[in-house]
Amino acid sequence: MSLREIIILPDRQLRLVSKPVEKVTPEIRQLVDDMFQTMYDAPGIGLAAIQVAQPLRVITMDLAKPDSGGETKREPRVFINPEIIAKSDELSVYEEGCLSIPEYYEEVERPARVRVRFTDLDGVVREEDAEGLYATCIQHEIDHLNGVLFIDYLSKLKRDRVMKKFTKAAKRAGE
């Protein structure tokens, strides 16, 4: 396992539409391992492969919270070629952030419940229902696979401010 660099806004790669994974290979398994290590190190609860410059339809997630003793039992989840096949009319609002848009958070409204179809690391196609933060995170990460960022759900004014801030920061950093 190794840490991978997380690409940061305004990097244009974040707007790429990721390609489907044809088969779960040792290279895909290595990518998943690296994504988990990178996500945990950041720290974050979700990561799309495109965020580590791999335009493949792979996401990793772990919504585990510390227990009363302060210990966190990890609950790693992998979704290969995920797609939302159903969503509720009911909406919910969560404050979202993104490892590719560091230290910026805004409330985003999304369907409260979704049904997702995906392939697991064993190559088995599965379907799963998700609600609450789980549903929000799945939608956020699948958006990444389609070149969509959570700031795209904000007003034009807020979105433009965020883009300006991160574009200036990238110029200062010499990118």
Curated annotation (Swiss-Prot):
Q: Which residues form the active site?
A: 141
MF terms per GO, please?
metal ion binding; peptide deformylase activity
Which reactions are catalysed by this chain?
Answer: N-terminal N-formyl-L-methionyl-[peptide] + H2O = N-terminal L-methionyl-[peptide] + formate
Q: Which GO terms describe its biological process?
A: co-translational protein modification; translation
- Zinc as a keyword of this entry, yes or no, is no
Q: What residues does Fe cation bind to?
A: 98, 140, 144
State what protein this is by name: Peptide deformylase
- Species whose genome carries this gene: Bradyrhizobium sp. (strain ORS 278)
Q: Which gene is this protein's source?
A: def
